């Protein structure tokens, strides 16, 4: 049997539960994943003066072929996107600017420094998201930025953040797709602080200054991202979960939840329904924390599937902005993008092929036996045949056949880079 014939057979299994598989694939095709550019060069960026990676972030490995400039990074993204079904967005950090060899400090970045990214996105029908890069810089060397006691340093990062929001607005206007601009800072202390309130007050005041500048939400949406701890900030993080949840709620901006930014016993899948009750939209950075915020490549595991189910069963595909955030320099970077992105989409498909209404009904009835039994039986339903057809329909490789393309690209392109 060919892919289409297997699909038609598998469809019948789901139709028994009232699931319209053709409609599911049409809906899935509307979902845009925000694919992070920084997997392609190990979070180095293209500033004229290169700074060492900091902010408690680590990218381990020395697999050959990392992109050395924006042109190479776009070429690598082109290859990865040709292996991922659907039309998506690309997420940029401020350090991925292009300045023709001129030094431009972070607080001086302008839309023109990202014109090539916009041109490329237009040509490929992509949207762009953005992030100020508030780490890996001399003015973040002591681990404090927007909460720094030194007003000059705070003001520098305030200017950078405002400039970043204006770039987000530029992306939205040029591409006709709303840009999400996300603020994350590494601020915190290695050991027990003697003042927890002061840095948080300064952070609040800095954010107030940043968001005082009015930008049309049609073009740019703002969000803030918390973290439980980082390397070098084990004892105290200024931008904690409680801080940002309150700040976002009070100021009518979005919260972004990174799956690696919580205590290891906490899961984002359990947080989504609470957020969706109170927030119009929620943003995600889907990662894979191994014992800490290690940013491993996203795999098709239980938590990823549960996150997708929470989005789908709560009818929130248009309310949850899904971004990826991982970086692994120990494996082929095109493969890393492909694996993580395909897994995220696969998890959404799995959620959409789940009899959510029936399972909800069983829970309301208190029929926990049948609920568990049905959940378990659906784990071996023929979703793989649906997935393969979805890939074929989107003109991307079916099954593991994409690996061959990555190997050829490595041989022809990546291996020739120093």
Swiss-Prot record:
One GO MF term: manganese ion binding
One annotated GO biological process: L-lyxose metabolic process
Source species, domain of life: Bacteria
Pfam families, sorted: RhaA
Cofactor: Mn(2+)
Assigned keywords, A-Z: Cytoplasm, Isomerase, Manganese, Metal-binding, Rhamnose metabolism
Catalytic reaction(s) noted: L-rhamnopyranose = L-rhamnulose
Pathway: Carbohydrate degradation; L-rhamnose degradation; glycerone phosphate from L-rhamnose: step 1/3
Biological function: Catalyzes the interconversion of L-rhamnose and L-rhamnulose.
HAMAP family xrefs: RhaA (MF_00541)
Family: Belongs to the rhamnose isomerase family.
The protein, known as: L-rhamnose isomerase
Gene that encodes the chain: rhaA
